[in-house]
Amino acid sequence: MLLIDELDRTDEAFEAYLLELLSDWQITIPELGQMTAEEPPVVIITSNRTREVHDALKRRCFYHWVDYPDFQQELDILNRKAPDAGADLKAQLVSFVQKLRQQNLFKAPGVAETIDWAQALVELNCVALDPQMVDSTMGVLLKYQDDIARIQGSEAARLLAEVQAELVTSSIAVR
């Protein structure tokens, strides 16, 4: 098995190299010459869509979109990765992050940011989200200044109020 993670972050020379590998199951290494696989490996390629991957390379791949987890799946991930965060805090922050993903952002927060945010909030002894805490830790979730500027302040407070109202009315089992 061969994992090529974040292909879109490589240069075109690497894509050409990979194209040779996927076309003929062989590679050319200047110091060693041409090497051919005895058995074609299973190749998994990931991309974060930071740039377009060459069409010739995409034609040799099966495409599978992996969407963000739903609320319960992301909560389960946090239960494993941030066990010190309280159940109510985890429910609030997962719901908040999922609302952020629905906004028109340059880069929506991924699961890694959800985990990082939970761990940061634990370090800050946070037991429940409030607008000030959300604003002061927004940089853990959003990685572009335009996104932060768009969400911080009244928009973050509005999203948080929605989260809190939904969690109260839905009686989501968070434990």
What are these regions (language model features)?
Residues 1-175:
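C-terminal regulatory/interaction module of P-loop NTP-utilizing enzymes
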